[in-house]
Structures are given as C-alpha cells and as structure tokens.
Amino acid sequence: MSGFFIILVLINLFPLLNTFFLKQKEIVGIAGKYTLLNPPEDVLRLISSPLITVDQNGEIQPVLAHSWETLNSGKTYRFHLKNDLYWSDKKKFTAKEIKYTLKDVDVKVIDDYTIDFNLKQALVIFPIYLTQPVIKYPLEGVGSLYSVQSYRLEKNILKTIYLSPNKPGAALKVYKFYNTEEDLINAYKKGEITSFNTLNRTLAESFVKWKNTKIDRNVDYSQIITLFINTRSGMLEDRDVRKALAYASPQFNNFGVPAKGPLPPTSWAYTDDVKTYTLNEERAINLLEKPLSSASASAKLKLYTFFDYADIAEQLKRNYENVGLKISLKILSYIPTDFDLLLTSWTPPSDPDQYFFWHSTQQGTNITRLNNVKVDKLLEDGRRIINVKQREKIYKDFQKTIVEEVPAYFLYHPFVYTIHRK
C-alpha cells in the first residue's frame, strides 16, 4: 500500500519535478545591485513588451497598443490598447496598470483600453519614448517570452530571479546577482552559475584552458566607449585642441570595433560618411602649436575615468603627453560634476534623437557643455519632423557636425565576452 502511495505522489508531482529538474536550465550571473523597481534591461525584455517598437527602418510599429492618434494640436497622444492580452498573473491587461514616469508628461487613463499622454509642448516623435517594456509591480509582464516564477530579495536587493518560459521547449532561466565581478567569477568557478558576460578580455582569456568552458565574443553596439571633452574648459574651448586629442588617440582594436560617431551602425539613421581621425601625432602636434604657446596652456588637463577603463585611460594619457599635453589621470568611483576629459561607457538611445545630450539648453545632461547653433538646429528639426527619410537626412548631418566639432571622441564599441559551460 505504501509503495502505491509513493507512486501516486510521484505521478502527481511529476509536472513540477519536470519543471525544476528535467528541463534545460540556464543560470546567468550578473554583477551589480538591482531592485524590483529597476531590474536589468535583459530581464525586462524577456518578461514583458512595450506599447510600440521602432523597426530597422525607423518606422513605429504597434505591440501592446493597436493604434494611436494626436489631439489638442499635437500635445496629447491617445493610445488604444489591445483588449485580448493578460498579465503574467493571469489578470486582464488594462490601461490602469500602465505606469510611466516621463518628464513634463501627464498620464491619464480614459477607460480600460485607452490612455492619454498629455505634453506641455507638441512633440511629433513622442511615441519613441514608449518603447520600454510595460511592467506591473512586482515584475509582472505581458505578451512576453518568459514570466517571473519567483524571486529572492535581501534587504530589498534582488539576489535571484527565476523565469519560466511561456512557450514549450524553451529553457528555464535563472538570474543570480553578485555585488562585484570578483564574486561573479568565483560563482562561476564554484558551479553556481552556467554563464556570465564581461567586457574584460584578460578575464575572458583566463578561461581559455578550461575544458568545460566555451568563450563567445560579440560586439556590443549598444555601448560606445567615449572620451567626453568639456568644451568650456580652458584651451579645450579651441576646436583645434579637441581635434588634436582625436588625432593623438590610438586605435583599440583589441578591445572593440572602432566607432564612427554618436550613433551605432545598428541605427537606421547611421552613416559612416563622417570625418575620420586616424592616429597622426604630427598632425596633432601642428594643431597644438599655437594653443600651447599661450600662458593658459600651462595647466594640466584632468582626465577622469573609472576602474574598468583604467588601461585605456593610461594609453590615452601616454599618447597625449607624447604630443606635448600635460595630463593628470584620476580613477573615480563616482560621476564627477566637473572635468576636462571623461572616459566612460555611453549607451545612446535607440532612436537617433540625442537632444538631451548635445543641445545647448540641456545643462544637466549635456555634460560636454557644447553650444553649437548648427547642432541645436539639427536636433530641434529632428524632433519636429516625423517623416523617416527627412529625419534620416537630418541625423546624418548631425553626425557629421558632431564629429567635426569633437565635443567627444567616440573610441569603440566594446567586445563582450560570454563565458559559459559547454
């Protein structure tokens, strides 16, 4: 009788056991601190969908919304939602659960399937700001590949997220979070995780001789390792000095693919028809001859960066000193409020609209303090026009102008290494 009871229990539990033990499972490690309010972008994209998306041709396509229109002279965008969708908790997807926090935008629910976004000023490209996945707290998604099965917190910090596939045959996914990259590496070595990503080539190469490990290398076009230049700091106001920095910068082919400008080649508005600055010390020295002859050039340029880019910063420092500049390098653990040169990673928005980063009125986000009439006009026109072909022309001109003005030097799109079990 007891044997029959055990068999009966196993039969009843088999679906659950199959889910946890028999299905393929991928355990991904991530370094960093995340909460229920700001989970990693990779997780968000797996567990939910946005109202709209922008295709490779720059056209806006519906996802959770089926249509939209403008009212109030373009100051109100009314979105109509699909009425046959459900959250991952099996509850009906309606407008009242949609939470967007957008500057200068008032969100108003009209009915279960209609929502208004009221702007202070008309903005024809507004829908592009609705491409983020819609999430209902905590971590409930809609129309997605995966659902959050469970999660674990420690002092409100995410430690583990378990994802269950919404389609048969897909692997289970588990995300484990670690405070530092060192903790992440140790977790892989101890078998706690099956894969993790890193930008550190030396770290990736340390696993080459591991027989049970495979290393994949890809280019992360969503990031640009960039040298930002304070265009209002001493001799850096002189465009020739900024160009000299570009000409004196080495290639970093071992670290990534050279960047051409502020847009990645994956953007529908990208152009490589821009000025290029290949390493040319003689050209840099000639450009610096007049600026360096002035008394104001005696001060050192402060180059700030973070630990992850210390090696790159050291190479830049050596090259800049070779052409006559004085450089003071400092490794920081915080974002500086003032700098001459700042080397860091930058993630451009998916749409070519970069108004917040380069327009002269954007004091909080235009960290280079660029004040250029042509750039301002191009950025304003790009937000005013909805026609994709016209916008493409505007942003090609924008890229050319930014590269000519050199408020930043765009070094490379980094290689990302995925270390995973075979």
Model regions and ranges:
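Structural transition elements
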Residues: 247, 257-291, 310
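Aromatic- and charge-enriched surface segment that lines or borders ligand/interaction sites
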Residues: 67-106, 187
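Extracytoplasmic/peripheral linker and loop segments enriched in polar/acidic and small residues
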Residues: 328-333, 356-421
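Ligand/substrate-recognition segments at binding pockets and active sites
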Residues: 3-7, 289-348
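N-terminal lobe/hinge region of extracytoplasmic solute-binding protein
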Residues: 26-72, 80
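Ligand-site clamp/hinge motif
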Residues: 163-206
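Periplasmic-binding protein-like
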Residues: 232-268, 402-407
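Gly/Pro-rich hinge or "lid" segments in bacterial periplasmic/extracellular proteins
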Residues: 119-172, 181-182
